[in-house]
Design a protein with these regions (language model features):
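C-terminal cap/loop subdomain of S1 sulfatases and analogous C-terminal strand-loop tails that border
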Residues: 1-93, 171
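Long, internal low-complexity/basic segments
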Residues: 75-92, 97-99, 107-182
Length: 182
């Protein structure tokens, strides 16, 4: 209300975001944090292709708003490289939003930015702790990933829209809920 009433407001120094998935086939947990200038993205399943990238671009495109292979190939190297990174993201990505607002150049290996990386990693871990983000626990991440993989294989093999004939178990191990405690 202070801003509304003409007062001053203390603005945030960081903004955090999370993506886990909209449905089992696009499960791909990511967390990000940005400061005024830099953005860090953590890709928890960098050992596999990003299913959203598969669905929105490339030869197996499932959804219209994405880019076709021909459209991607017609782009310059920076755009093609961005699509390649979208499909096969590294464990972490770091962008200088002042110099590179479109996030083309991943600076994660730039040693001159070690202090920036340390700060963003620390603030992201703090936020994950404050919000009780269970994905930060490797055991929980593995269990949730196995559950998504099982459901995707059994219910979504022939269609991205799949079946709804399954039950999730994640509430039990993420939040300690069970049938009796609903």
């Amino acid at each position: 209300m202070a801003l509304w009433e003409g007062g001053t407001v203390a603005w945030r120094d960081y903004v955090c975001a999370e993506w886990t998935g909209a449905n089992p086939p696009v499960y791909f947990p990511q967390r990000s944090i940005r400061s005024e200038r830099y953005k860090l993205i953590v890709n928890y399943l960098s050992d596999r292709p990003n299913p959203s990238a598969i669905g929105y671009s490339g030869p197996n495109q499932l959804w219209e708003p994405g880019a076709t292979v021909e459209e991607i190939l017609a782009c310059d190297d920076r755009v093609r490289n961005a699509y390649a990174r979208y499909l096969d993201p590294p464990p972490e990505e770091l962008f200088d939003l002042e110099k590179d607002p479109w996030e083309y150049d991943n600076l994660i290996d730039d040693v001159t930015l070690n202090d920036v990386k340390t700060d963003l990693r620390s603030k992201l871990a703090e936020w994950q702790s404050e919000t009780d983000d269970r994905i930060a626990d490797p055991e929980i991440l593995n269990r949730l990933t196995q559950e998504h993989d099982t459901i995707s294989a059994s219910q979504y093999g022939e269609s991205a829209w799949g079946s709804r004939d399954f039950e999730w178990n994640y509430a039990d191990y993420l939040f300690g809920h069970n049938e009796a405690g609903k």
